[in-house]
Amino acid sequence: MAVREDITQDTLMGGRVHLRQPGRGYRAAIDPVLLAAAVPAGAGEDVLDVGAGVGAAALCLARRVAECRVRGIELQRELVHLATENVRLNEMGKRVEIMVGNLAHPPPRIAPGSFSHVMANPPYLDPAANDPSPDRGRRTAMMESGGGLALWINHCIAMARPGGTITMIQRADRLDTLLSLLTRRAGDVVIFPLWPFDPFDEANAKPASRVILRAKVGSHAPTKIMGGLALHDANGEYTADAEAVLRHGAPLLLGPL
């Protein structure tokens, strides 16, 4: 298959997932791999990917978990076209489908309360505190609009079955907002920091800039903070634990449900 000049062909999970994506603007890197690794899906379960982009997280999850089914919705039509190509490229047509849709008015086939798990990589940036990117695709992917994080949380909760899980990756400085939006609607929240370096290495330790958050819809169990994952060693290389997830398809274990 020929690749257009403005489209690159990349791989994730050590070549297990092939990905065509825009050469400019927002590009899938490690975040969708980490997100997919944290979803506790099993064979035969249905998963919704909210804001699916070019299908990176959906395909990583489907590659890791045999026989799970993943549907995704994405606002940008051009990304859905690429996602559909990526589904074919990875021979996942029987288990992965990405559709055009928005959170306020999802496609009719995305029925509320029908998914065992919902995953999302919401826009990271609050427009009140950040300047928008001049690139439209990157701006849409990275900058909140409309109902902001509340719209994303409302949609994810609505789509999950009672007792189903919501898994998100987000900036650590948005954690207060996420937790307040989940209050009394989902519990058993797990906060899993993504550390740039080993947090116990005094010479290199830095605060976690991103976290993975998992919650169970309808639960009232207390919130837990896990040890998280150190992404890099002192030399700037991926740690063995990060390599296992990013290149070898290992799951991120956030604790029992």
Q: What positions do the PLM features span?
A:
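Class I SAM-dependent transferase core
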Residues: 2-42
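General small-molecule cofactor/ligand-binding pocket signal
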Residues: 20, 97-99, 190-192
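Conserved Class I SAM-dependent methyltransferase catalytic core
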Residues: 24, 146-199
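Residue-level signal for inorganic ion chemistry
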Residues: 35, 121, 152, 215
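Conserved SAM/SAH cofactor-binding pocket of Class I
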Residues: 38-134
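Structured catalytic cores of enzymes that bind and process phosphorylated ligands/cofactors
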Residues: 47-50, 86, 115-117, 178, ...
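Mobile active-site "lid"/loop adjacent to the S-adenosyl-L-methionine
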Residues: 122-152, 158
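SAM/dcSAM-binding transferase cores
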Residues: 202-257
